[in-house]
Swiss-Prot record:
GO terms for cellular component: cytosol. Belongs to the YajQ family. InterPro entries: DUF520, UPF0234_N, YajQ-like_sf. One of its GO terms (molecular function) is nucleotide binding. Keywords: Nucleotide-binding. Nucleotide-binding protein. It comes from the Bacteria. The lineage of its organism: Bacteria, Pseudomonadati, Pseudomonadota, Betaproteobacteria, Burkholderiales. The keyword Nucleotide-binding applies. SUPFAM superfamilies: YajQ-like. This is Nucleotide-binding protein Bcen2424_2555.
Length: 161
């Protein structure tokens, strides 16, 4: 019985490369001369450092641009609040989201059941397994999910016949 998994996962290697490119651009840009602006990464947590709110916005824009160039969807980023650290300096923690959340998984299952396509959906951890008897049904399910779920980037992998 053909099946595939619906997941939501950023390519962390590309995220790391985008951070390195962002730091390189920040270190060479004229408007950041003499400032302590940078992006640091610990696992799935990115920390943006800057001298003030304006420069923090600039750092964020550089990072988003580099992520977009490396085909990493910016909807994976979950921004924390801006915190003041010593003096005028500020930092912001950005989390890279992973996995299909419980609410989104339920929404996907509901969409699949309401679509009247002859497939079954089951929640398996942080993924949703879609299985059906015909490959065409699975492909139409993928098209329907791409159209209807716009708030979170979805990937479709583990396609089996």
């Amino acid at each position: 019985m053909p099946s595939f998994d619906v997941v939501s996962e950023a390519n962390m290697i590309e995220v790391k490369n985008a951070i390195e490119q962002s730091n390189k651009e920040i270190s060479t840009r004229f408007d950041f001369k003499g400032s302590d602006a940078r992006v640091e990464q610990k696992e799935r947590e990115l920390t943006l450092f800057a001298d003030d709110d304006f420069k923090l916005g600039q750092v964020k824009d550089v990072l988003i641009g580099k992520l977009a160039k490396r085909n990493v969807d910016v909807r994976f980023l979950d921004y924390g609040k801006v915190e003041k650290i010593g003096g005028d300096k500020v930092k912001q923690v950005v989390t890279v989201k992973k996995g299909v959340t419980g609410d989104l998984a339920k929404k996907i299952v509901r969409l699949v059941k309401d679509s009247k396509i002859k497939v079954q959906a089951s929640i398996q951890g942080d993924a949703v397994r879609i299985s059906g008897t015909k490959r065409d049904d699975l492909q139409s399910t993928i098209a329907m999910l791409r159209k209807d779920v716009t708030d979170t980037p979805l990937d479709f992998n583990n396609f089996r016949d």
